[in-house]
Amino acid sequence: MKSTTKDLVFIALSTTIMIVCAFITVPFYVPFTMQTFALFTIIGLLGTKKAFISICLYLLLGAVGLPVFSGFKGGIGSLLGVTGGYLIGFLFTVIVSGTLLHIFSKRKKCTVVSYCVAMVLGLIVCYAFGTLWFLLLYTNSTGSISVTSVLSLCVFPFILPDMVKIGLSWYVVKLLKKHIMRL
């Protein structure tokens, strides 16, 4: 397969995987989904540029109204709502984690530890952006809320599940990367 055709296929498949993982949901104020697992796996398999395009496509599909977000939601309101910052934060996760993975792989130091460090740092950026977004929008629409309350609602419950997803994504990337490179 030609490189550009192969890239387009992988980007489309990754976007589809992101959509499917958004539908695997445990309802909560900020829903528990498998999106972050898909995000970490996409970054690990595709690298920064292609992963960024895939996540942009995912967000664009949702923004135009297709029900690709958790709870079968879509529309610009999903992105601009109080929890939309976490979705937009996925783009920052791609940039941070993908760049770090690239640096580690150039130095031949892309181990499970460096993979996890790259993903955790990207996730922290996503948490920070999403939390700040939530705090600003919630405060403007409803009234004052403390940072601790937002963290308790939107971040703390997700830390352990996200760490498990990072470990699981490393395993999946390790299994699939060698096969994808052969295509």
Residue positions per predicted region:
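Hydrophobic alpha-helical transmembrane segments
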Residues: L8-L13, F37, T41, F52-L57, ...
